[in-house]
Amino acid sequence: MKLAEALPSQRVLRIGLLAAGVVAVVATLALGGWFWYRSQESRGLVALAEASNLAQQAQGPGATVEARERAIKALEAVVSGYPRLSAGGQAAYQLGNLRYAAGQYPAARGAYEVALAKGVSGTVRTLAAVGIGYTWESENRYDRASAAYEAAARSTGSKDFLYEESLMDLARTQELGGKPSAALDTYKRLLKEVPGTRRGSEIQSRVASLQSRPAK
């Protein structure tokens, strides 16, 4: 065989061997990455369990400020140390609750937003959205609180108890924000969309009070 004829076949062989080597390396890296991820996930879940236990103790009767700070630091470590943790959103939500209880409203809001960004779903998602509203309301930012409560109501259905709570929160902040007409509309909406509401008498009382106010 002439040299010119042999070169193409040798190149094909080398390319094939190189490709096989690359595939083997990629497979090894992928396997190693999977094991690393599983290891990180396991450690993260253990850390979250420990932090959640501290959080539960910090929210119990007779809990001290020091206990709450320990729980906050533990949850902060989980959120920052395990950014890919499957339950990272749950950790951020718990962190938001503790920060809110400590009066750290901007920090609590940030934690709730992280929980939403990490894809928490169902009840926790709605609670995180409501939590954002609570932080704005605590700062007397009623327009922003109303927007957060309305977003929370949109994230659930009328048969969910959190839908009712979100609309009640919305109406309250509308009243506090000097928008009685909007609050009245929200209360009426709640009576229409949740006719069997357990808070019917309370809502009717608010409706009567708002309707009795002199028009401005």
Model regions: which residues?
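N-terminal positive-inside, membrane-proximal cytosolic segments immediately preceding the first
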Residues: 1-25
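Short solvent-exposed coil/turn linkers within tandem alpha-helical repeat scaffolds
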Residues: 79-88, 102, 116-125, 153-162, ...
